[in-house]
Structure formats: C-alpha cells, structure tokens
C-alpha cells in the first residue's frame, strides 16, 4: 500500500520537472528580479491596454465618456481591490506549504480556497449590483456622465466572478514561483480586449457599454487559460481524493490571510472614493484630468506593485523553509531595484508629462492636459515612498501578518479622507494631487516599524 511518505516523494519529484521555481535557494536579487519581470511586463501591458482603452473612449466617444469611465474607477478599486487582495491572501499558505515541501497540505489549501472564492464572488457580485446606482450618487458623480458611468460599472460588477477566478488561479500558479504563464495569459487577454474595443465601440457604436463588454469577455478568456494550464502543466496544484475535503483549520488560515488583505484594498479604496468624490465636485474637467493622470500613473507605478507581489511569494516560500536570513537580504535587494526604477521614471515624467496626457484628449482640451500633467509630476516626487510601501506591505503579508498590512490600508484611508475634507476645499485641484503622496507617507510611518517587529519575532521563533 502506498504510504504518505511515498506520495510526498513522488510529488516532490514531479515538482522538480513542473513549471515551478524554488525561491528558497539562489541569489535573492536574481530570484526576485526573475519573478517580478514577467509580472511587471504583464501589468505594463495591462495598463497599456487601459491607456489604449481610454484613448479610444476619450477621442472617439468624447471627454464626457472618458470622465464616466473615470468616475467609476475608485468604486472599481474598492470592489475589485477586495477580490484581488483576498485571492492574493489565499495564495500565501500555498506558497508557504510549497516552500516547506508539504505538497499534500498545499493542495488542501487550494481546494478550500476555491470553495471560499466561489462564495465570496457570489456575495460580492450580488451586493455590488444591488447598490451600484446608490454608490454613484454618494460619490457625487456629475449628472451629465451618470448614465454612462452606471452602465459601465454594472458591466464591470457582472464580471466579478471572472475577476475572482483569474486572481485565484493565477495567484496559485505564482505561489509556486511561476510568474511567466500569467504574463502570457495577460498578453492574450489584452490583445483580445483591444480588438473587441475597436469592434464594439467603433464598429458597433456601443459606447462605454462596448468597453465594459470587451473587458468581460477578455477576462473570461484569461480564466479559461489559467484552468487549462493548471490541468495540463501544473497538476501539482490539483487536489486528489481526501485533499478535496472541507477543512476547518485550513479554511480559517485562508480567511485569516485573505480577508485582511481584501479589506486592506477596500479600506484603501474608501479613501480613494472620498478623494474621487471631492474631485467630482470640482466638475467634469477635473474628473477627466483625474482619469487621464491615473491611467498613466498606474502604467508607471505597477512596477512598484509587482516588485511587492514578488516579495510576497519570495517571503512566503522562505518562511516555509525557515530561511529568515534570505527574507532580510531580499527586502534590501528589492529596495535597491525600486530606487533604480524611480530614477528612470523621473527622467521620463518630469519633461514629458504634458505630451503623455495629449494621448488621451484633443489638443484643444488644454486645461485637462495641464491639470493631469501637474498630478503626474507631484506624484512622481513621492514614488520612493510608494515603492517602500509596496515592498514592506507585501513582505509582511508573505510572512503571514496580513492584519498588519490591513492597518497600513487604514493609514492610507485616514490620510486620503483628511486630504478630501481639508486640502481639496482649500487648494482645489492641487489638493487632489497631494492625496496619494500624503497617503503613501502615512502608510510608511506605520509599515517601517511593523516590518522590523515582524522580522525580530520570526527570527526568535526560528531559533527555538
């Protein structure tokens, strides 16, 4: 009869030939860079799609339609941020189990994560669809763009189960050190999305509804590709027999990681909604400028975000292997990468911000271009604060202290609410531009001592 030890040995042998990467050995800088690069390229590609999407909407439908999509962005961050954060949290125990070479427990986490995600996706979708109109009213969406914003947002909410699916399965693939395949799936999805944008917006004349439908269909494709790859090339993740059972302990651990991370994004999203609401009250021009600048900002800042994502998997695997020395070295190397990239962004944004903004709107919209360029330049000065935030936050998450990372989201929310209540009324658009920098700095004031405390605690535990 086959013993559990035999099963583990067979699984370990399969892991060596599967499309996985052990981040507990080798140069930390090389491992982090190797893992982060496909993530960065994938998200740059995804953000470039958003840039193209905004250009199509802004130039062929109009500034009003662009503002309608932008008015929905902070609400989308609130809801989709919860989905993304929860699924990222579910991947942490998977990464830790993989690092510890406990593959049976890893698959038990996978099975229970799928159950939890299905329930969460259903509940979040129903609540979002029910309260969509009321939320748009609460954030002071201008009347002239309300209808388009409502249609676009409803279509995005209908795709929440697909968002959950892609983030769950791609997160599990990345937990095993493979960031390449999700990158390839994003390429395919983005190309399909752009083609559908052209067909549905320009060809069929569906307006912002066409943009929403295109996103829905491309997300469905990305989920199918993830499932296909896991079944064909990463069977190490597929639960078998008793590994499919419901497990209270594993479910509790998954929720303890996923819910705080999901809430962290949503709490941050509340602050962004407050800032969006204050900006909406300044009129359609400021809404369009905010939309334009945010699209370009995400194109640049996704690099910081994905260095952080790499750190979550890196720290999770090394914690499982009890290699805290590598965690410290990895964090230092990630900060070096972040600072090098900041210099690159400054060289591009400071001289060329106005030109970038003209990609979105006609040259006659000088006020929109000027305001958006101002937003980009102010934010760029504080990119090191953002880079430090993402590295420390995701490292803390990967080490299993998701509650602390959630508190950093609370710090961001408090900062953005304060800016919305005091700086925006006093400084108007300049106050809006200061929203992100103030939030990033306030989160760092919390995360720096929190990360040092987590390190000391885990090193003491490792010596016992």
PLM regions: where:
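Hydrophobic transmembrane alpha-helices of multi-pass small-molecule transporters
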Residues: 78-81, 125, 193-198, 223-227, ...
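Transmembrane helical elements of multi-pass membrane transporters/channels
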Residues: 34-53, 155, 189, 218-222, ...
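Short alpha-helical transmembrane segments in multi-pass integral membrane proteins
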Residues: 1-36, 94-159, 203-259, 315-382, ...
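Residue-level signal for short hydrophobic patches within transmembrane helices
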Residues: 25, 29-48, 52, 75-82, ...
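Helix-terminus/linker motif at the lipid-water interface of multi-pass membrane proteins
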Residues: 48-67, 136-143, 199-206, 266-299, ...
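Small-residue-rich hydrophobic transmembrane alpha-helices
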Residues: 66-126, 163-182, 289-353, 386-408
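Short runs within selected transmembrane alpha-helices of multi-pass transporters and secretion channels
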Residues: 87, 155-174, 182-190, 211-224, ...
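Interfacial/gating helices of multi-pass transporter permease domains
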Residues: 57-77, 143-148, 208-209, 250-257, ...
């Amino acid at each position: 009869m086959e013993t559990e030890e035999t099963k583990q040995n067979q699984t370990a042998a399969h892991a060596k030939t599967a499309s996985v990467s052990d981040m507990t050995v080798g140069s930390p800088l090389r491992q982090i860079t190797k893992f982060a690069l496909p993530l960065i390229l994938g998200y740059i590609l995804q953000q470039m799609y958003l840039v193209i999407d905004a250009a199509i909407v802004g130039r062929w439908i109009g500034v009003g339609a662009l503002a309608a999509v932008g008015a929905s962005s902070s609400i989308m961050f609130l809801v989709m941020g919860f989905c993304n954060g929860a699924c990222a949290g579910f991947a942490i125990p998977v990464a830790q189990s993989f690092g510890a070479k406990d593959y049976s427990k890893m698959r038990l986490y996978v099975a229970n994560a799928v159950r939890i995600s299905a329930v969460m996706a259903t509940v979040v979708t129903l609540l979002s669809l029910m309260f969509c109109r009321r939320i748009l009213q609460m954030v002071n969406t201008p009347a002239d763009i309300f209808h388009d914003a409502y249609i676009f947002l409803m279509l995005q909410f209908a795709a929440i189960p697909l968002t959950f699916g892609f983030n769950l399965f791609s997160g599990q693939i990345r937990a095993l050190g493979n960031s390449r395949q999700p990158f390839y799936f994003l390429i395919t999805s983005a190309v399909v999305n752009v083609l559908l944008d052209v067909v549905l917006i320009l060809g069929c004349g569906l307006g912002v509804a066409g943009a929403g439908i295109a996103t829905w269909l491309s997300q469905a494709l990305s989920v199918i590709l993830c499932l296909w790859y896991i079944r064909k090339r990463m069977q190490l993740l597929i639960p078998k027999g008793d590994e499919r059972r419901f497990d209270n302990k594993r479910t509790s651990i998954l929720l303890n990681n996923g819910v705080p991370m999901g809430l962290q994004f949503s709490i941050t999203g509340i602050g962004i909604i407050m800032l969006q609401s204050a900006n909406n009250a300044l009129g359609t021009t400021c809404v369009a400028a905010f939309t334009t600048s945010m699209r370009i900002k995400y194109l640049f800042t996704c690099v910081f975000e994905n260095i952080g994502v790499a750190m979550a998997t890196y720290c999770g695997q090394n914690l499982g292997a009890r290699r805290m020395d590598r965690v410290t070295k990895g964090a230092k190397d990630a900060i070096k990468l972040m600072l090098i990239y900041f210099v690159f962004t400054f060289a591009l944004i400071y001289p060329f911000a106005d030109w970038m903004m003209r990609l979105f709107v006609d040259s006659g919209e000088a006020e929109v271009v000027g305001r958006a360029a101002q937003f980009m330049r102010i934010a760029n000065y504080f990119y090191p604060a953002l880079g430090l935030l993402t590295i420390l936050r995701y490292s803390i998450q990967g080490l299993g202290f998701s509650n602390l990372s959630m508190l950093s989201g609370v710090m961001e929310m408090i900062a953005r609410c304060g800016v919305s209540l005091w700086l925006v009324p006093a400084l108007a658009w300049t106050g809006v531009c200061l929203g992100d920098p103030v939030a990033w700095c306030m989160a760092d004031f919390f995360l720096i001592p929190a990360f040092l405390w987590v390190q000391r605690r885990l090193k003491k535990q490792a010596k016992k």
